[in-house]
Amino acid sequence: MLEFCPNELDTKTLHQYLLSGIGPRPIALASTIDQNGNKNLSPFSFFNIFSAKPPIAIFSPARRVRNNTTKDTLENIKKIKEVVINIVNYKLTEQTSLTSCEYPQKVDEFIKSGLTAIKSKKIRPFRVQESPIQMECKVNQIIELGKNGGAGNLVICEIILIHIKK
């Protein structure tokens, strides 16, 4: 059996061990907007549901390892505390992968991925029409877990409206 202390591994190797150790992993396709209304769409594998009453989902945009910067998603929700968590199924795998590419800030990942943006009912960010479950959320809290590349930021979201395809 392999044994190691996490602080003895480089971030990339540790990340791979952690992700492969827990599975299958649900994927949150998070939709946000910036202060100018530009849409952003990004997948997160650090994601799950943590409470039913109140209904709480948490996902974690990590700081980039290569340059210790943060993602547009995190910057957007710091200013506009709303997010749609769209659940990814097998049919959305390829399109979701396209949203994970590094695009300049104002590039619309809905267009790049071919996914359809539809208006939400209670918040400003758009839903992904093709997603089987779409959760409109208010961001209650962001907990920064560290300052180094690879450090997560827990985004604690209260689900205020759920859309489920029949």
Q: What is each of the regions a protein language model found here?
A:
Residues M1-S42, N48-K166:
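Active-site-proximal mixed secondary-structure blocks
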